[in-house]
Amino acid sequence: MTHGDNRDGPGRETRSSGPLVLASASPRRVDLLAQIGLVPDAIDPADLDETPAADELPRPYAERVARAKALAVAPRHPGAWVLAGDTVVARGRRILPKAEDAKTAKTCLEMLSGARHRVIGAIALVTPEGRLIERSVVSQVAFKRLSAAEIAEYLAGDEWRGKAGGYAIQGRAAAFVRWLEGSHSNVVGLPLFETNALLAGTGYRPGRDG
């Protein structure tokens, strides 16, 4: 596989035919792609039931959801590169939910306090030829022990809302992290090195206007 250093330099302005479609409504993934010079031509999130199956393990679950997103959206965009991702926070074999309310976020933070957890990032790409390519990445994160006051103060904001595991490492929760092993961007929402390499390896080249 080739890695994405072909984006460097002013002379490389061509792109293989076909647009890039992001099968996600996550603003974090849009921002992360922008960091490496990738701007989707379209954003078309998949509407899926993302409930884990009984006894489904975290990594296979993340891979299944990313794959399902890409395959659901690809038929709507023939001739495009369709990129999908899924991020899962796991403590042991347990998949932590996306926190949609403060009670859920509090439960997640209490579970993560003083402990190590995994963040699994799965990406799936459907090429213009209809080929499905998948990758998954695991980052290890260790939180310091959180006091009740620290948790309450964090929950008083809203950056936890909608986040897997009830926290956003790119925000105030960065102060909770004792150490991190692996991809930081994966913990934010998309493993950029692997995403860039996957796209470059299939012939995608970002276009540039002007």
Swiss-Prot record:
It comes from the Bacteria. It is found in: Cytoplasm. Its cofactor is a divalent metal cation. GO terms for cellular component: cytoplasm. It catalyses: dTTP + H2O = dTMP + diphosphate + H(+); UTP + H2O = UMP + diphosphate + H(+). Residues 1-15 have a biased composition (Basic and acidic residues). Its main location: cytoplasm. It holds the Pfam family Maf. GO terms for molecular function: dTTP diphosphatase activity; UTP diphosphatase activity. The record marks 28, 87, 170 as: Important for substrate specificity. Residues 1-22 are annotated as: Disordered. GO terms for biological process: nucleotide metabolic process. The keyword Hydrolase applies. Keywords: Cytoplasm, Hydrolase, Nucleotide metabolism. The active site is at 86 (proton acceptor). Its EC number is 3.6.1.9. Nucleoside triphosphate pyrophosphatase that hydrolyzes dTTP and UTP. May have a dual role in cell division arrest and in preventing the incorporation of modified nucleotides into cellular nucleic acids. Belongs to the Maf family. YhdE subfamily. This is dTTP/UTP pyrophosphatase. It comes from Rhodospirillum rubrum (strain ATCC 11170 / ATH 1.1.1 / DSM 467 / LMG 4362 / NCIMB 8255 / S1).
